[in-house]
From Swiss-Prot:
GO terms for biological process: pseudouridine synthesis; rRNA processing. This is Uncharacterized RNA pseudouridine synthase slr0612. Belongs to the pseudouridine synthase RsuA family. Keywords: Isomerase, RNA-binding. The lineage of its organism: Bacteria, Bacillati, Cyanobacteriota, Cyanophyceae, Synechococcales. The active site is at 81 (nucleophile). It comes from the Bacteria. It catalyses: a uridine in RNA = a pseudouridine in RNA.
Length: 261
């Protein structure tokens, strides 16, 4: 490749700190790599039954993100299972995706889970301590019993069993492993029937800063959205993301925009 090695590495570092498969890049004759189009980020309320991808090559195609979002080059920040609902960020900025999704940054993700049975507060203690599965141990979660939230009816509805009641839990994680909430509730004897991600709380603090220092916080919710709807980021959110990537999430912009918890 004829481009200077330093220039190439600098640009790859800008994309993600590593080259991310699936992200839009252009290869010019000179060998330089450039991002295709201005990075864009949106907030989406994923409905039940929708795949967290834009294509489905199965024999019987299922609903995908493409049925709701007609924007190019977007990729989910983390995933929601097909049978899960709620808050999903999508971005064309690979570095931002890494900063928001990687477990090392320990951003909080809150889920409301409708479970089978009537757990007590004591039943939730294993979730708070962390559960060790055969393939990994979970981090301690924030878990509590809540009243039934006011969500739109699910289509199709969950299958009720007349002899078994259901309850709602709020579970907050600082990691996002495959089907983690469902595995955790099943492990303590209360299988999840419906799962909705309701909040993502992003802190500007890096792991190296430690817990003792204050940091700007971006608390993202489903407010203003119905299932299947999406919105672009607000100016405040755009500024937060920009400063998050430059390593100065508590810079001068904080005085202007404040801490939107």
């Amino acid at each position: 490749m004829s481009a200077p090695r330093e220039s190439l590495l600098e640009l790859v570092d800008y994309v993600l700190g590593r080259l991310x498969l699936g992200f839009p890049v252009d290869f010019f004759p000179a060998g330089l790599i450039a991002l295709n189009k201005t990075p864009q980020t949106i907030v989406f309320y994923k409905p039940y039954g929708v795949l967290c991808q834009f294509t489905d090559n199965s024999a019987h195609p299922r609903p995908t993100l493409k049925d709701y979002i007609n924007l190019p080059d977007l990729y989910p920040v983390g995933r929601l299972d097909q049978d899960s609902e709620g808050l999903l960020l999508l971005t064309s900025n690979g570095k931002l995706q890494h900063r928001l999704a990687h477990r090392e940054f320990a951003h909080q993700r809150t889920y409301f889970a409708q479970v089978e049975g009537s757990p007590t507060d004591e039943d939730l203690e294993p979730l708070r301590r962390g559960i060790t599965f055969a393939d990994y141990p979970t981090r301690p979660a924030i878990a509590k019993i809540i009243t039934e939230p006011d969500f739109p009816p699910r289509n199709p509805p969950i299958r009720y069993r007349a002899s078994i009641p259901t309850s709602w839990l709020s579970i907050t994680l600082t990691e996002g492993r495959n089907r983690q909430v469902r595995r955790m509730t099943a492990a303590v004897g209360f299988p999840t029937l419906r799962l909705v991600r309701v909040q993502i709380q992003v802190t500007g603090r890096s792991p190296q800063q430690g817990k003792g220092k204050s940091a700007a916080t971006w608390c993202l919710t489903l407010e203003g959205l119905s299932p299947g709807q999406w919105r672009p980021l607000t100016p405040w959110e755009e500024n937060f993301c920009q400063q998050l990537l430059t390593g100065n999430p508590n810079g001068p912009w904080q005085k202007k925009f404040g801490d939107r918890r």
